[in-house]
């Protein structure tokens, strides 16, 4: 279809929806989508290609016109978690210490949506050695070996040792902490990481108010390492005392697990990634769903720095001010973004899903800057406090939600987004997000009094300035709220 014909066609679709549902809100569309996700489409949708109407079209339309009345009953998930840990610790007079142990965890999950039972076992053996030298240097080193299985997949992780594969994955960590002077500390650490996908990430199928979670049987374990260098300094000036801390960090992942929103075929739970997939979904007659699926990002690098300070200013024996301030700078980079962009530039199918909303180098759903401040003034039995949180804009989101790339005409997915997410007073999800994806700050206040030794009251105002902000598409921050809390100690 040409862009003009496509525009005329979709304008007709939206006009028809407005005529059928003249007073529909975004919540109504969510009810409708949820109903279609649960009940599917009319049977034999493939017959429409031959001009034949499905035999159950009339009752299906009745459900569409009143999705709340025809909602399916709630399906309950059940989860059982059994955890056992044994730890042995031994100290010597010379400052050495060894900690070793075994951990076992068994998880059994029943999905009400698929009526399937999945089980996992995680066994780990670990050992850590700690030693202090010259009353200034602390050394720590450890190793942990893990075995993991889900259902009948008994070798979720393999390690090659002398040419043979064993079903255990070892990870190592080490750290140093050196006291340079009184209240001055230098530290460094290095640690490997390895995490198997959970039952939730691999097998979960759930529908929550029109948004689903879909399984990915092919998701792989994520692995990587983290390194940190930090300096901590104590300070005291008159009645003011506290600590300041500066740290730089670097983390690298391979096959990092992230979630991706998209459209799915409810017949086989696969992601709809082409017009052919959409036609097959119509033929299957089980309907579509919008939701998230966990998948692997080939390589990611996250580095940055953190600056923080906490302490106390004492006015007199009855009054003091406690504070905690922190700033974090992060560079969350997708190391393979150039290769992915080159591949996505070859896409020709109008329904083919891209990784994220832009061609940038950053991972999804992460800001670059964040700042947090907590202040508490205490006077006898009364305390007054405030929290200030500031975050910079989100760097990228999922492609199904919006496309930030420049284009001369809307494409097919832009119209699909309009149908999926609706609009309110001319405001679409994309336009609202572009307007509100900015730096934002929120302020919370609290006032408390300790009535007796056992009873305390606290009055809180969250989002004092009633700031309207959005920390991701379809998630608007709560408006100003008032909370009264009573604590009783027995």
Where are these regions (language model features)?
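Gram-negative outer-membrane beta-barrel transporters
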Residues: 98, 135, 239, 247-252, ...
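Residue-level signature of outer-membrane beta-barrel architecture
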Residues: 88-90, 121, 127-132, 137, ...
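Transmembrane beta-strands of outer-membrane beta-barrel pores
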Residues: 3, 104-110, 117, 123, ...
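Face-selective signature of the C-terminal outer-membrane beta-barrel domain
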Residues: 1-157, 245, 304-309, 324
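Transmembrane beta-strands of outer-membrane beta-barrel proteins
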Residues: 1, 96-102, 139-143, 186-188, ...
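C-terminal beta-signal and adjacent terminal beta-strands/loops
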Residues: 194-195, 254-255, 259-264, 389-430, ...
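Outer-membrane beta-barrel signature, preferentially recognizing the C-terminal barrel domain
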Residues: 162-165, 169-171, 175, 179, ...
């Amino acid at each position: 279809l040409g862009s003009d014909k496509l525009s005329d066609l979709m304008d007709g679709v939206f006009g028809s929806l407005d005529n059928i549902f003249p007073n529909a809100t975004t919540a109504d569309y969510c009810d409708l989508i949820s109903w279609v996700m649960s009940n599917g489409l009319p049977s034999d949708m493939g017959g429409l290609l031959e001009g034949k109407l499905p035999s159950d079209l009339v009752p299906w339309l009745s459900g569409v016109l009143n999705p709340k009345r025809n909602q399916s009953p709630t399906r309950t998930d059940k989860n059982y978690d059994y955890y056992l840990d044994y730890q042995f610790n031994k100290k010597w007079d010379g400052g050495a210490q060894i900690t070793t142990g075994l951990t076992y965890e068994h998880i059994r999950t029943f999905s009400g949506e698929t009526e399937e039972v999945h089980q996992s076992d995680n066994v780990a053996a670990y050992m850590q050695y700690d030693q202090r030298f010259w009353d200034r240097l602390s050394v720590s080193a450890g190793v942990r070996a893990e075995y993991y299985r889900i259902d009948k997949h008994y070798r979720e992780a393999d390690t090659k040792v002398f040419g043979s594969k064993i079903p255990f994955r070892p990870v190592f960590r080490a750290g140093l902490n050196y006291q340079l002077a009184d209240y001055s500390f230098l530290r460094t650490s290095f640690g490997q990481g390895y995490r198997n996908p959970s039952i939730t990430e691999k097998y979960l199928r759930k529908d929550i108010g029109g948004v689903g979670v879909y399984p990915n049987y092919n998701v792989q374990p994520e692995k990587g390492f983290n390194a940190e260098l930090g300096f901590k300094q104590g300070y005291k000036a008159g009645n003011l005392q506290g600590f300041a801390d500066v740290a730089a960090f670097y983390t690298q992942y391979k096959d990092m697990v992230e979630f991706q929103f998209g459209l799915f075929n409810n017949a086989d739970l696969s992601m709809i990634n082409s017009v052919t997939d959409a036609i097959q979904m119509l033929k299957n007659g089980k309907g579509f769903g919008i939701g998230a699926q966990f998948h692997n990002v080939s390589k990611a690098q996250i580095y940055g720095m953190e600056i923080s300070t906490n302490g106390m200013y004492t006015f007199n024996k009855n009054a003091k001010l406690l504070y905690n301030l922190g700033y974090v700078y992060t560079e969350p980079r997708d190391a393979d973004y150039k290769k992915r962009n080159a591949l996505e530039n070859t896409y020709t199918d109008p329904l083919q899903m891209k990784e994220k909303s832009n061609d940038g180098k950053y991972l999804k759903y992460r800001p670059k800057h964040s700042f947090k401040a907590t202040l508490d003034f205490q006077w006898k039995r009364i305390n007054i406090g405030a929290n200030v949180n500031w975050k910079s804009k989100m760097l990228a989101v999922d492609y199904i939600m919006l496309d930030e790339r420049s284009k001369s005409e809307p494409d097919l997915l832009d119209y699909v987004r309009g149908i999926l997410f609706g609009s309110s007073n001319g405001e679409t999800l994309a336009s609202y997000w572009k307007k509100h994806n900015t730096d934002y700050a929120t302020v919370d206040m609290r006032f408390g009094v300790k009535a007796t030794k056992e009873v305390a009251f606290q009055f809180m105002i969250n989002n004092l300035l009633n700031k309207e902000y959005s920390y991701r598409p379809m998630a608007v921050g709560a408006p100003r709220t008032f909370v009264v809390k009573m604590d009783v100690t027995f």
